[in-house]
Structure formats: C-alpha cells, structure tokens
C-alpha cells in the first residue's frame, strides 16, 4: 500500500507541475502574479485558480482507510505563499469546503477540511518572507512538512474513533509529509521562473539604458553646441 501511495502522490505532483507550467504561460496569470496593485479582482481570481488546483488534488487522490491520500496542501499553501492572506485563505476556503462536501459524514471529512484551511493560513503567514526571497527551497520543504504534520495532528484530534485515526496517520503520514514537501518545492519552482524571467527582462532593460547613458555622456560633457553632438546624443 505504501508503494502505491508514493506512486500516486508522485503522479499527482507531476500533474500539478504540468498545470503550473501551463498557468505560467497565460499572460493573465503572469500579470496577476507580478502586479503590485493587489487589486481585489486579481486576488479573487488567483484564489479561485489555486482553489481549483486544490479540488483537482482531491479528485486525483487515492483512498486509504476512509481517507484520501492527496496533494491538496500544495495548492492552498502555494496560494498563501505566492498571493498573500487573501489568496491563501480564499483558496483554502474553496478547497476545504469542497473536501467536506466531497465526502460528507466521512471519517476524515471535517478534519481534512479544517486542515486545508489551516494550511492556507500557514502559507499566508510566510508570504512576506517568501516574496522577499528570505525562504529558499529548504525553507519551503520545511514549511510544507510542518503543515502536513499539522494535518496529521488535526486528524488525531478530530477524527473518531481515535484508534482508527491513529492507524490512518501511521499509514499515510510519512508518504504525504515527504512527497508533498518535495512536490511543493518543484511546484513553486515552476512559478518562480515567472519572477526570474521578469528580473532578467528588467536587467536587460537596465543594461540597454546604461549603454545609452555611456554613449551620451561624452557629448553631454562637451555640451550640445553642435548638430553632430545633438544627433549623437539622440
């Protein structure tokens, strides 16, 4: 069963990375990720997008002892890290509510819905540090692992009967913690390329601007007294 879970999680992570790659190619998504205005419309759109990613992860999960082994944490945690509190909480509400409605009365329906919301809060809490470049891949791995450990704790606190919850956590904890933490690093790396490309374009524009300044300075020092100097500066 453990090997099946590892394989399923790996497959789901691959699908999420594919989705992330396609999303980063859409001009609308790129502009929303890069914009500084933080318009509510953009925040809502990003929350829906990452909420749908979370829902997708629920559907592609594999059932195990009344629970669903999944990669849902990747969507909601990434929403918080990339988009901030509004996006993270919005995506978590969408993903968590769907998880509850997906299996109403199920053994882990409430606990998994609650943990999804908590994971969105965790991502939101680290958003400023992540955007400032203060959280590297190892930090992302650790945050995701801690979020998943939190999910296991919530399952133990809420799901009943307790012996069944304990058996479930013993079965799914290691695969979900390790694979989702690794998957989050790869998933965010896909989106980080958007910021890297933007920085590269900015650096190229600055290089061109400095080149123009270097070419113009000799003529500016002499003064624009001749037609030749004015044409050279232009």
Locate predicted features.
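Membrane-embedded alpha-helical hairpins and interfacial helices in multi-pass inner-membrane proteins
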Residues: 1-25, 47, 58-73, 103-216
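Membrane-interface helix-loop junction between the first two transmembrane segments
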Residues: 22-37
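Loop-to-helix transition at the N-terminal end of transmembrane alpha-helices
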Residues: 36-51
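Hydrophobic, membrane-inserted alpha-helices
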Residues: 50-54, 72-77, 91-99
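Alpha-helical transmembrane segments and their helix-entry boundary regions
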Residues: 65, 76, 80, 88-92, ...
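Interfacial segments of multi-pass membrane proteins
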Residues: 83-84, 97-102
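Short regulatory/linker helices and ligand/cofactor-binding micro-motifs at input modules
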Residues: 211-228
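Short, intrinsically disordered, charge-balanced linker/junction segments flanking boundaries
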Residues: 228-234
